[in-house]
Curated annotation (Swiss-Prot):
GO terms for molecular function: structural constituent of ribosome; zinc ion binding. It comes from Sulfurisphaera tokodaii (strain DSM 16993 / JCM 10545 / NBRC 100140 / 7). Part of the 30S ribosomal subunit. The keyword Glycoprotein does not apply. This is Small ribosomal subunit protein eS31. Its cofactor is Zn(2+).
């Protein structure tokens, strides 16, 4: 465990964006419920998930 909160590993925000010419574009989707950036998961089922509010969008065919 880190001694201070500052010593803990933080997310690298610069990996969330792509620079295209003079525009900055977000790589991932934004959560429609709370507005934070969602994570894309492939296993066990492909889905977009929000770590802040728990919102999940499943991708692909339903069984």
């Amino acid at each position: 465990m880190p001694k201070n909160k500052d010593e803990s590993q933080k997310a690298i925000v610069r990996t969330y964006y792509i620079i295209e010419g003079d525009k900055i574009k977000l790589k991932n989707k934004k959560c429609p419920r709370c507005g934070s950036i969602m994570a894309h998961h492939m296993k066990p089922v492909e889905r977009w998930a929000c770590g802040k509010c728990g919102y999940t969008e499943f991708i692909g065919k339903g069984k």
